[in-house]
Amino acid sequence: MSMSERTNDAQERALVDAAAAVLRRNDLGGRTRAAPRLYPHQWSWDSAFIAIGWATLDPGRAAQELRTLFAAQWASGMLPHIVFDPAVPPGSYFPDAAYWDCQRLTEAAPRTVQTSGLCQPPVHALAVRRIWAVAEGGDAATRAAGQAFVRESYPHLLAWHRYLATARDPEGSGLVTIVHPWESGMDNAPRWDRPLAAVVVGSLPPYTRADLQHVADPAQRPTPAEYDRYLWLVDVLKRARYDDAAVQRAHPFRVKDVFFSAILVAANVALLELAALSDAPEEERVAITGWIARGRQGQEAQWEETLGLGLDRDARTGQALVARTVAGFAPLLAGGVPADRRAALLTTLDSAAFLGHPGLRWRVPPSTSPADPAFQPRSYWRGPTWPVITWLLWWALVQDGEVARAARLRQAALAQVQACGFAEYVEPFTGEPLGSQEQSWTAAVTLDWLVGSGAPRAIGHGRPG
């Protein structure tokens, strides 16, 4: 082994140890804080990625992460986007459980834990499949525990996906309707500028944002005007008592989210495998297969040839929402893309609008293209790069057989983490770490790249789970 190879191995081992330490410091026993200060509770899609990271260390602990989240599932099937930790002091996070007031307003909310009234992208089936992939390679006891967890998780996942396919897509378009930018996971992305601008904000009580206390520069976070709209939309949901049918009829923000919808397609592919492992009835497997087909048709309907990207649609107006963001690569996540469209997506990805931009510190995707007029390199989802989104794009490329391209993306992503630590997001040109530090999902995807499904030996022996 050469000196450079020994150095690289030592650096990777140190990075694995550091990432594992972040998860352990944020570990609350049955769930993991998204971050130690800015995000002290359990977030839904964070927990799915976190479980993928835990799987590299302890499949049983990974399973417990999701088990805790499933215990907060609503009667409707919805997995809430926040599960509140009762031990967190009041005022540490806003809006808190009292602001959401879910237990009083709807019988659908769980009685044993406090949650928010929104959801987030459904990465969870991918996490369960990954936990099983690790457990399958273990001893007999580990395999048995993994199989039992798959069977335990499957009904929760099926109810969750059915909720999204019905209550959130009553038209059967194959595209999920989100009712708040927070549901997208990409809170202040330019994708939402037009529909948010149409929201007329009524009277709001005074409030104090806890998030601004944990960042050095308020420009890294959503603006006061955006936050007013976020809270007004929550108030409108509360007036509707979180009733999905009522919200779908009249809510002032309803958007068909291509990225959320593409993740659901990928999750349904995973769910179909989990259904087989669980000996699920044939009618359930047929339903899941139908959701996959319908979801891919929905992606096709939102293709924008000129930009070479998929676009969201405003469900209230029927208009496409034109924005050059990383969400436009949604069809790659959904899979089943026709060859000409796949080539167009990869051309866009390699172009100066994204990975080919000469100013990028690392060739990882900016959340919003520098070519988009709304690009802001330090503002949350309006420009910074996010390691967790890089992981999703890497995963999609591997699924698509673009192994060499995926390997380059992984290498760039690990170089970024090596330099920036486990930051929430990163300024794409200077490489400055932004947002929260010791972010659990950044540590989790780093672990997966290094010792999980992203390790070169794993890629060489099949697709990552």
What are these regions (language model features)?
Residues A10-A19, D58-A71, D139-L164, A267, ...:
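Extended, well-ordered alpha-helical scaffold segments
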Residues G53, A127-R130, V134, A267, ...:
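Core register positions within helices of long alpha-helical scaffolds
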Residues A250-R294, F375, S379-A404:
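Long, repeat-rich segments with strong aromatic
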Residues S2-Q42, L69-R111, G174-V258, Q297-T385, ...:
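Extended glycan-interaction surfaces of carbohydrate-active proteins
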Residues S47-G77, A327-V337, T390-V403, R410:
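Alpha-helical support elements that line or immediately flank enzyme active sites
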Residues S47, P121, A125-V128, S261, ...:
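TPR repeat positional signature
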Residues L105-G137, L392-A396:
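Hydrophobic/aromatic-rich effector regions of fungal transcription factors
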Residues Q120-R194:
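Internal, well-ordered domain-core segments that constitute the primary functional module
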